[in-house]
């Protein structure tokens, strides 16, 4: 079976680069430093307009931080799902937990029902749930299509033992997709030792600003942004290395 590559894309242009590099799918996100948040309507619509072959999945995450949501946040998520359906994207990506660290089954069912007929991926909320094997069975019962996971570790290489067990227990009932720290120099190892067939990675490079006048004394964001005059973007040549 051909290796399926999903690119974590932070912009419409990153979606273009991912498609040019031969990726199968993108997860379109804003707020990458926060782990990914819902992109704007304009970004999603532009990504759709500029691509023709690649599947676009959109993260539905109203904020960074934990995965315990208020009703106001849930309403926002439902509206964003409706917009994604209107724009005819391929799928949506979300994950919700209870205060005790379990999958919030009623809320996930509510969101999955709202998302139909779109594909649904449970994101790395799974990696901070209390019991991954119970969560696995719950997500299968809910009709989730795939789980994005680092094996409840800081990166997918460290999570190989759990990822392999999840693939075994899933037995084709749901797709287990390793992500976080998947690189061209370790994807073969992860593939061989887990049996996974889909992989999530960023394949980004730094893009330097073309600004000539620069006032570097006035930052526009927090200290986690290294410079106002550089951004990151999917690199089609890096994508090709994973295919």
From Swiss-Prot:
One of its GO terms (cellular component) is cytoplasm. Keywords: Cytoplasm. GO terms for molecular function: copper ion binding. Gene3D superfamilies: Copper homeostasis (CutC) domain. Its main location: cytoplasm. The keyword Cytoplasm applies. Belongs to the CutC family. This is PF03932 family protein CutC.
């Amino acid at each position: 079976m051909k290796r399926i590559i999903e690119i974590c894309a932070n912009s419409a242009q990153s979606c273009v680069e991912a498609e040019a590099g031969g990726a199968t799918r993108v997860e379109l996100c804003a707020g990458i430093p926060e782990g990914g948040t819902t992109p704007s309507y304009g970004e999603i619509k532009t990504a759709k307009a500029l691509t023709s072959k690649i599947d676009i999945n959109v993260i539905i995450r109203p904020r960074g931080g934990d995965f315990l949501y208020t009703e106001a946040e849930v309403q926002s998520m439902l509206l964003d799902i409706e917009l994604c359906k209107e724009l005819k994207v391929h799928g949506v990506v979300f994950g919700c937990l209870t205060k005790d660290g379990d999958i919030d089954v009623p809320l996930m069912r509510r969101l999955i029902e709202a998302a139909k007929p779109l594909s649904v991926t449970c994101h790395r909320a799974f990696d901070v749930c209390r019991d991954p094997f119970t969560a696995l069975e719950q997500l299968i019962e809910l009709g989730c299509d795939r789980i994005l996971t680092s094996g409840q570790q800081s990166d997918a290489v460290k999570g190989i033992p759990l990822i392999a067990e999840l693939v075994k227990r899933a037995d084709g009932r749901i797709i287990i997709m390793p992500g976080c720290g998947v690189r061209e120099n370790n994807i073969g190892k992860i593939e061989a030792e887990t049996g996974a067939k889909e992989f999530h990675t960023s394949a980004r490079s730094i893009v330097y600003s073309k600004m000539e006048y620069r006032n570097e004394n006035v930052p526009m964001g927090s200290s986690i942004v290294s410079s106002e005059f550089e951004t990151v973007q999917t690199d089609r040549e890096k994508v090709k290395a994973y295919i």
